[in-house]
């Protein structure tokens, strides 16, 4: 399937570990930790970061464009480029859906764009989360209250 999608390529890394300093976060020393499933390099000199996702039938358009899902690849790209000193213009990101129940086309690869604006937005979300963690600001998700054992008790946060 990779040959069909990418043509001629070489495997650059498998299960690459990222432990990169988050330079955008100044309140504390923090590293971004991630594991990239596969990085290939195509004959045009581009790197392709691929993240495997298991599913039953595939993803609808809403899930394919969900920020919190696609930002994972955006941040992988940012920190991969930081680690290897690679120009982000030479890196593309993709999800590879491994469909358990599909009879045909049980692997689907699709590109996720990660330009400068999206990278900035993903980084901002990451930094804001780290600020809240550092300051011990716990955001309450009221949608989860009904199932909580502390719902409407004095221990309710």
What are these regions (language model features)?
Residues 69-81:
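An active-site-proximal "capping" alpha-helix that borders the catalytic cofactor pocket
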Residues 68, 72, 118-121:
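Short acidic-hydrophobic sequence patches enriched in Asp/Glu that either
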Residues 61-69:
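Short alpha-helix boundary/capping segments
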Residues 78-157:
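Metal-dependent nuclease catalytic regions and adjoining charged, substrate-binding loops involved
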Residues 57-61, 104-107:
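Short small-residue beta-strand/loop micro-motif enriched in glycine and branched aliphatics
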Residues 33, 71-74, 143-146:
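Non-catalytic, well-ordered alpha-helical scaffold segments
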Residues 1-59, 85-92:
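Catalytic cores of nuclease domains that cleave nucleic-acid phosphodiester backbones
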């Amino acid at each position: 399937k990779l040959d069909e999608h990418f043509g001629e390529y070489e495997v650059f890394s498998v299960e690459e570990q990222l432990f990169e300093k988050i330079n955008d976060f100044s309140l504390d020393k923090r590293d971004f930790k991630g594991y990239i499933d596969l990085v290939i390099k195509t004959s045009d000199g581009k790197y392709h970061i691929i993240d495997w996702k298991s599913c039953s039938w595939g993803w609808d358009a809403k899930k394919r464009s969900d920020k919190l899902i696609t930002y994972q690849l955006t941040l992988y790209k940012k920190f991969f480029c930081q680690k290897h000193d690679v120009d982000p213009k030479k890196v593309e990101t993709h999800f590879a859906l491994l469909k358990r129940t599909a009879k045909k086309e049980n692997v689907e690869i699709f590109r996720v764009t990660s330009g400068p604006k999206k990278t900035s937005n993903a980084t901002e979300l990451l930094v804001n989360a780290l600020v809240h963690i550092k300051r011990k600001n716990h955001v309450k998700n009221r949608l989860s209250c009904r199932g909580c054992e502390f719902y409407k008790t004095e221990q309710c946060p």
